[in-house]
Curated annotation (Swiss-Prot):
PROSITE patterns xrefs: BAND_7
Transmembrane intervals: 42-62
Subcellular location: Membrane
Protein name: Stomatin-1
Species whose genome carries this gene: Caenorhabditis elegans
Pfam family, one: Band_7
InterPro entries membership: Band-7_stomatin-like, Band_7, Band_7/SPFH_dom_sf, Band_7/stomatin-like_CS, Stomatin_HflK_fam
Length: 330
């Protein structure tokens, strides 16, 4: 690069005298405006004090204001914000030039109207909620946003639709606490620049279409029936295993079956009934059917065979009995 070109570029980079004058006037304009506004404010304040002095003591009642314990007063003097928040208790204002707004610091509740929401699995549900919030910075809630309360209410509706739209129907029904916590965090982050603190969010009611309710009821009933069948099958399996084990044990002992048979007869005899039906051993019929020499079998009528069997039992157990075609009666 030639030295002449360097000099030309430096001259172009340096502002001209006219440009410096314009910049100086622009920079000095806010200072001059602030100076003029300060003089005007001082004059108005002085005239207000003179008016207060001339109308004393009537003007004292116009200067004294009271703020409740749960309120704070944000004061504007000639349209400018007074940095200090007033309250609670008594504070003084200058009539005609001071205005103030009372800000309630108590927790307010807002019932979010029912919102039609399309869940992530394309199911339309109606959900309503309740939001609890309060003002923690009175000045910011007045200066930072046009209407902090209404803005928070509108934001609660949009946040409810946005967050629930990212969840499935089963998650909405089962994870209400988690969804409420996510909604609280989202609202709190959005309203903090407005001087609003979100204390709590609760999903109050989730309503499903009638067709979806019937489908879910049928699914729940089918699930319960399937569970009951599984439990019954498992019970039968355990009972069968126990019976098989008992049969194996009894088969290994010759007297176990006889003892079990006697216990059963004892239990039946203790019942107050005139008719008792009990199993009849087929071995007795086999012994009775074989009559005569050479072991040749002869067929007897069933009634006579039963009577003969019962007579044999009488001789063994000395128990009086009568037989019928359907069974034995004691």
């Amino acid at each position: 690069m030639q030295p002449s070109e360097t000099v030309e570029m430096q001259e172009m980079a340096q502002p001209s005298g006219q440009q410096r004058d314009v910049e100086a006037r622009v920079q000095s304009a806010p200072a001059n405006h602030s100076h003029d506004a300060g003089c005007t404010e001082m004059f108005c304040i002085a005239m207000s004090y003179v008016l207060i002095f001339l109308t004393f003591p009537v003007s004292v009642f116009m200067c004294i204001k009271i703020v409740q314990e749960y309120q704070r007063a944000v004061v504007f003097r000639l349209g400018r914000l007074v940095p200090d928040v007033k309250g609670p208790g008594i504070f003084f204002i200058i009539p005609c030039i001071d205005t103030f707004l009372n800000i309630d610091l108590r927790v307010a509740s807002y019932n979010v109207p029912s919102q039609e929401i399309l869940s992530r699995d394309s199911v339309t549900v109606s959900v309503d909620a309740v939001v609890y919030f309060k003002v923690f910075d009175p000045i910011t809630s007045v200066v930072g946003v046009g209407n902090a309360t209404d803005s928070t209410k509108l934001l609660a509706q949009t946040t409810l639709r946005t967050i629930l739209g990212t969840h499935t129907l089963s998650e909405i029904l089962s994870d209400r606490e988690k969804i409420s916590a996510d909604m609280k965090i989202s609202l709190d982050e959005a309203t903090e620049p407005w001087g609003i603190k979100v204390e709590r969010v609760e999903l109050r009611d989730v309503r499903l279409p009638s067709q979806m309710q019937r489908a879910m009821a049928a699914e729940a009933e089918a699930t319960r029936d399937a569970g009951a069948k599984i439990i019954a099958a498992e019970g039968e399996l355990r009972a069968s295993a126990a019976l098989a084990e008992a049969a194996t044990i009894i088969s290994k002992s010759e007297g176990a079956m006889q003892l079990r048979y006697l216990h059963t007869l004892n239990a039946i005899s203790s019942e107050k009934t005139s008719t008792i039906i009990f199993p009849f051993p087929m071995e007795i019929l086999g012994g009775i059917s074989k009559v005569g020499s050479g072991g040749t079998s002869q067929n007897f009528p069933v009634q006579e065979m039963m009577n003969a069997a019962l007579q044999s039992i009488q001789r063994q157990d000395t128990v009086p009995a009568t037989a019928s075609s359907s069974g034995s009666r004691l």
